[in-house]
Amino acid sequence: MTRTVFDGPGTRAADPLAANQPAAGDDAPDYWAELIDHIETRRSAIEDPDQANFFNRPFSEHELVEWLSFQAYYELRACQFIGGWLATTPEPDALILLAQQVEDEALHYEYCMRALARRGVTSLDDWTPEPEWEEWIDVWYPSGDTTIERVAAHNLTGELGACQAFVQIRPRLPEDVQKAFDRIIPDEQFHMKLGRRVIQRHCVTEDDRASVLARVDRTFELEQAGRLAYNRRMARLGIADLGDTSPLLS
């Protein structure tokens, strides 16, 4: 299966955006990097480095099933809402790249469900997401009036959190789940590069930048609410104390 590659070695080949003609925004300052810095500044203001012990202990089987269930739910919803964007994505380059991402998210859902099946869970029918997760993933992510607003929310803020989370949490995972996420992480990194390309090419006016920044900030706030909801859920299930550091869900 042919994939798109932006830089460095990888499985994605034949970048459809590598045309000789310059496109709008190609020579613009790297607003993407500014947005990354903005998110990291906000994150550093609320995270307590003394609570990093969350990442230094193995998951219990119960918590692992809960975490994998969340990830499967997230990946399935991402496949569905990104697929829903395609009919209203006027930019041909973004359309091609987002269509590739839909397939990736579907495969990630399958990988998570396989890991759950090895633990006796074959369906999410009896698993209910927290209200904060539904507001964040089911309501907010599918919204956005333009491609750059949608990509700023999910492929920037969301995928940045996911990449960081998976790398940090990986040592806590059993070997079979590590192998699954070793397949997922490069895709998440590609999705960030996809987002950067779209933002650089199509976020070109001051109004564009203002709308993108607003989406980034609101997504960050919903992500934080989602993490707190995860802690409350773990405490309610007797898996962890309410004061434990929350995982970077996504």
Language model features by range: what are they?
Residues 2-250:
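Non-heme di-metal
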